[in-house]
Amino acid sequence: MGIKPTYIKKIGIELLEFHEEKFTNDFDENKKAVASATNVPSKRVRNRVAGYITRKINTGKFKK
């Protein structure tokens, strides 16, 4: 889908650092976790952040 904007990456990395236990490799569960952990006003941004987090977990590229 292309390169993610830096604000998506920043939100995703912060969420993974502080709430890692909430996220899994399932996109739908991550959407709910992003909605509960943040106050992102738009569905589009929430879905992009959830997708970024899911991709990081599935590829194993997230490191503490």
UniProtKB/Swiss-Prot annotation:
Which GO terms are recorded in the biological process aspect for this UniProt protein? Answer: translation
Q: Name the encoding gene, please.
A: rps17e
Top-rank taxon, per record: Archaea
Q: What's in the keyword line of the UniProt record?
A: Ribonucleoprotein, Ribosomal protein
Query: Which GO terms of the molecular function aspect are on file?
Result: structural constituent of ribosome
Matches recorded under InterPro entries: Ribosomal_eS17, Ribosomal_eS17_CS, Ribosomal_eS17_sf
Q: What is this protein called?
A: Small ribosomal subunit protein eS17
GO cellular component annotations of the record: cytosol; ribonucleoprotein complex; ribosome
Tell me the protein family, please. Answer: Belongs to the eukaryotic ribosomal protein eS17 family.
